[in-house]
């Protein structure tokens, strides 16, 4: 029995008293953000600065998409402001942030859901799945998948009104911020307009 229990622990079948790991507080990488309502995928390079509550998102061009604009977003939560910069013209919009800072991590009061491997034999990564599910509320509004080693985000999914609304996949992550100036808005934002720009022409 002890041998069987040890095997299950190693393979991720059973995890006793799992505790949320501490995710990196600063990193850069790439994401795919999927809006389930519209069916739209947005690929982007991301710089994440947890201590200063800053996020920079640079949309990636993947092929020619007719009449599609690509933007850079600089979100400064401590200042409650977001800058939207059109990548070609550098036109800038300054928009108030109304949502609170939501870090990429596993909250301390999260519920452990599962542990498993992603990938196949010889090329696999162990991850843990956590949620905000509580005993009095059977359904969760957030599910996060993080690597066991180094606690990097793999996927986060949000649900509302019993349906999945958004999901984000993370990849190519490396710790630290190579150039902190990416969080500084360009000079065109000194005369920014106060309305969000349309993504289509």
Where are the regions that the model predicts?
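Non-transmembrane domains of secretory- and envelope-associated proteins
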Residues: 10-19, 97, 104-126, 136-142, ...
């Amino acid at each position: 029995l002890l041998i069987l229990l040890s095997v299950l622990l190693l393979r991720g079948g059973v995890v006793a008293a799992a505790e949320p790991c501490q995710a990196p507080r600063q990193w850069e990488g790439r994401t795919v953000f999927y809006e389930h309502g519209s069916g739209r995928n947005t690929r982007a390079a991301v710089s994440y600065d947890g201590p200063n509550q800053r996020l920079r998102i640079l949309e990636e061009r993947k092929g020619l998409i007719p009449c599609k604009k690509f933007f850079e977003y600089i979100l400064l939560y401590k200042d409650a402001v977001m800058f939207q910069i059109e990548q070609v013209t550098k036109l800038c919009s300054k928009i108030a942030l109304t949502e609170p800072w939501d870090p990429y991590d596993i909250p301390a009061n999260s519920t452990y859901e599962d542990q498993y491997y992603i990938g196949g034999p010889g090329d696999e990564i162990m991850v843990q799945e956590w949620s905000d599910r509580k005993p009095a509320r059977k359904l969760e509004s957030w599910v996060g998948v993080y690597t066991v080693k180094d606690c990097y985000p793999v996927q986060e999914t949000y649900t509302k009104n019993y349906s999945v609304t958004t999901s984000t996949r993370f990849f190519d992550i490396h710790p630290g911020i190579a150039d902190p100036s990416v969080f500084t808005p360009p000079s065109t934002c000194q005369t920014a307009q106060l309305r969000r720009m349309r993504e289509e022409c």
